[in-house]
């Protein structure tokens, strides 16, 4: 008997594996430090706005997320008509791939880039082309060397997850200048709110002055609205028009829209998170380096640490040791970083516990 067969290439896609979600155990506190979630939660104003939506759950949302687009426009100085909102920036990444990629096309991503990129590429029948990195950092020349007449899209996470590295805005502009004009450059700025480097820019200037570059962002990270799945894209009118033609008519919920509007207006809550992140990013890097671990310099709300390959001291050993103590980090074998763990910057308590636990782990004979 025959059965339905997926399109060619679908079963070749490795499913996305999220960070572990710990199972609570009686008598033990568990800290989830595997998914880059904020330890502060959402703004209280966002929570209040979310609760207010409970009185209107029978209503369809406004289909274009107009109020949220206008709030984003005010916050960033953007034209709301050039903004699209989605169920997380993940949905928008998939919409872009669905709009611009098909069989015979190629999309380029960096060696340790976000795993949604190859999934979105392959799901649309296109070829995923990987550009090598330099010191776990996007290499513009490597990307440009991979361009062929079949290249239709380039994914650029800046800063990048899971490495925590970034490239200066001058390098982003050099990349755009080196790409053919028909290639869409996607600037994924999910972690932009945590970057304090003077040579970094989110990319608004580039999007505003070209017709082939888009910027995506999310409310899941610094705004703490990950469970609501809400994100956005700023792009040229031609790309916005094309993507809107296949976007679902009610793809963001009323609770998500209202919470996001309140979140983007609460700049004090965002600033608090930034200060906490910067303080602990420096401290954790220093402490882990003292233990003999190699820590990749990060500009995000997480740190990437590399472990020895010696039996008993590997990343897998450390992961098991920490998990038994209720400290859940992210193993990165699926990112081809089998000797590394990524730690979300958590509460003061969680961070201190990880330092103490890794100190004990590294001191073991």
Swiss-Prot record:
One Pfam family this sequence matches: Aminotran_1_2
Keyword Amino-acid biosynthesis carried by entry: yes
CDD domains: AAT_like
Positions bearing N6-(pyridoxal phosphate)lysine: 221
Top EC group: transferase
Record has Transferase as a keyword: yes
Gene3D superfamilies per the UniProt record, alphabetical: Aspartate Aminotransferase, domain 1, Type I PLP-dependent aspartate aminotransferase-like (Major domain)
Functional pathway: Amino-acid biosynthesis; L-histidine biosynthesis; L-histidine from 5-phospho-alpha-D-ribose 1-diphosphate: step 7/9
SUPFAM superfamilies for this protein: PLP-dependent transferases (SSF53383)
Reaction it catalyzes: L-histidinol phosphate + 2-oxoglutarate = 3-(imidazol-4-yl)-2-oxopropyl phosphate + L-glutamate
Keywords from the UniProt entry: Amino-acid biosynthesis, Aminotransferase, Histidine biosynthesis, Pyridoxal phosphate, Transferase
One GO biological process term: L-histidine biosynthetic process
Enzyme Commission number(s) from the entry: 2.6.1.9
InterPro entries assigned to the protein according to its UniProt record, in alphabetical order: Aminotransferase_I/II_large, HisP_aminotrans, HistidinolP_aminotransfase, PyrdxlP-dep_Trfase, PyrdxlP-dep_Trfase_major, PyrdxlP-dep_Trfase_small
GO molecular function: histidinol-phosphate transaminase activity; pyridoxal phosphate binding
Reported cofactor(s): pyridoxal 5'-phosphate
Recorded family membership: Belongs to the class-II pyridoxal-phosphate-dependent aminotransferase family. Histidinol-phosphate aminotransferase subfamily.
Quaternary structure note: Homodimer.
Protein name: Histidinol-phosphate aminotransferase
Organism expressing this protein natively: Rhodopseudomonas palustris (strain HaA2)
Gene transcribed to yield this protein: hisC
